[in-house]
From Swiss-Prot:
Pathway where it operates: Carbohydrate biosynthesis; gluconeogenesis; Carbohydrate degradation; glycolysis; D-glyceraldehyde 3-phosphate from glycerone phosphate: step 1/1
SUPFAM superfamilies: Triosephosphate isomerase (TIM)
Catalytic residues (positions): 118 (electrophile), 188 (proton acceptor)
Top EC class, one word: isomerase
Family membership: Belongs to the triosephosphate isomerase family.
GO molecular function, one term: triose-phosphate isomerase activity
Recorded superkingdom: Bacteria
The organism of origin for this protein: Chlamydia trachomatis serovar L2 (strain ATCC VR-902B / DSM 19102 / 434/Bu)
This protein's name: Triosephosphate isomerase
Biological classification of the source: Bacteria, Pseudomonadati, Chlamydiota, Chlamydiia, Chlamydiales
Cross-referenced CDD domains: TIM
UniProt xrefs under InterPro entries: Aldolase_TIM, TIM_sf, TrioseP_Isoase_bac/euk, Triosephosphate_isomerase, Triosephosphate_isomerase_AS
Amino acid sequence: MFTDKETHRKPFPTWAHLLHSEPSKQFVFGNWKMNKTLTEAQTFLKSFLSSDILSNPQIITGIIPPFTLLSACQQAVSDSPIFLGAQTTHEADSGAFTGEISAPMLKDIGVDFVLIGHSERRHIFHEQNPVLAEKAAAAIHSGMIPVLCIGETLEEQESGATQDILLNQLTIGLSKLPEQASFILAYEPVWAIGTGKVAHPDLVQETHAFCRKTIASLFSKDIAERTPILYGGSVKADNARSLSLCPDVNGLLVGGASLSSENFLSIIQQIDIP
């Protein structure tokens, strides 16, 4: 058992309700990447799930463990307000793809959402926008929420190409989704991930506003207004509040700082709710 009986909480509403509810909710997702053994995950969750910080219904929290921990983590968080995410998925439902995991498999073990196109998938594993569009569609068709990750490199940012890069990633990455699809967007400038460099809140707001305007042009103003747009890139407790104060920032995608329950809870505690 990961948790004691008294730490169990009533589950939060469904994703459909959350993504159509008032825009004041903030989302905070912790991406564990390729970290933690089962024992380490047990230790983390025992501490994490016992915190009263998680009781705020205006903050929607999710953890994104590696594939090997998804089933165990799902059992641990099933009676809590925590949602479960996967770090990627394959675009096909099944087949001869050794080492891959499909969206129906993830949904079957209780995964709620899945990252699509995290910068490390794009730049280390060379995942391209057309394939990511298929992965996002696969997540939707399997009943999960895709979290499309977009972002520019330092060279692209310094050359003034940020909006062109993001427009291309959004236009192609969202092209296979149904017109009324529910999805989440995560802006993660590549130059800020794991580097300790954080985009200035003014730049974050400007970029998020551009992304929302683009979503409106691709889908509708209504979908743009209700689509959560998260920021990711060296998020820590000392910058979480200033980032969450940006009008078009609806939450944070946290990397290394989410590996410690104490640090992750400190970030959640800093989130500003209007």
